[in-house]
Regions:
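PRPP-associated nucleotide enzymes
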Residues: 1-192
Length: 192
């Protein structure tokens, strides 16, 4: 909720915390070990899907002790003419040449599967040596496209979540945990 009160705490807008800050930090260490093992002695291009994955990627790559290059891609989701289906569109492209590289795409959440399916489809045409995906959150119950991530931080219920990079109307990304936004705030009046 928009609030110019200096005593406002955005955690007050959270109905329920589903992944604590401590759980995130512990899982980052384990996820880093999994990725290090998978890419041992290989040069990896890590591609972050931003804005949502920016905090996750920043924290995760500090757990990696592999040879890596980092690039970012920005995706926006737009609705078809019938206003029912989101179509991912690349807003900012990567600069790395992926040909012959091992590629790891990192995103904040896998829910419908549309974004990661779209991005991996595009990247496959760039002839990488291998292509894997990593997500902080896997929300299986809403999957509309058959897609599985190779590395998963947490599997979560079908709830609208914010925090640790995930937003609602560009808010709540700064929260150190992941929580469910209070129901009355999920359809607020227009924020300025």
């Amino acid at each position: 909720m928009q609030n110019n009160d200096p005593t406002y705490n955005p955690l007050e807008d959270i109905d329920q915390i589903i992944v604590t800050e401590a759980a995130i930090q512990a899982r980052l260490i384990e996820l880093g070990k999994e990725i290090n093992e998978a890419y041992e002695e290989r040069d990896v291009a890590v591609i972050a899907i931003i804005n949502g994955a920016i905090i996750f990627v920043a924290d995760l790559i500090r757990q990696l002790n592999i040879s890596m290059k980092l690039d970012c891609i920005r995706i926006a989701n737009y609705r078809d003419d019938d206003k029912s289906i989101q179509k991912p569109e690349i807003i900012d492209k990567i600069r790395l040449d992926l040909k012959g590289l091992d590629v790891l795409i990192i995103d904040d959440i896998l829910d419908t599967g549309r974004t990661l399916s779209h991005v991996t489809g595009i990247f496959k045409t760039m002839q990488p040596a291998s292509l894997k995906t990593c997500v902080l959150l896997d929300k299986k119950t809403t999957r509309s496209i058959d897609f599985e991530a190779d590395f998963v931080g947490f599997r979560i219920p079908d709830e609208f979540v914010v925090g640790y990079g995930l937003d609602f109307a560009e808010r709540y990304r700064q929260l150190p945990c992941i929580g469910v936004l209070r129901p009355e705030l999920q359809n607020p009046p227009e924020w300025s």
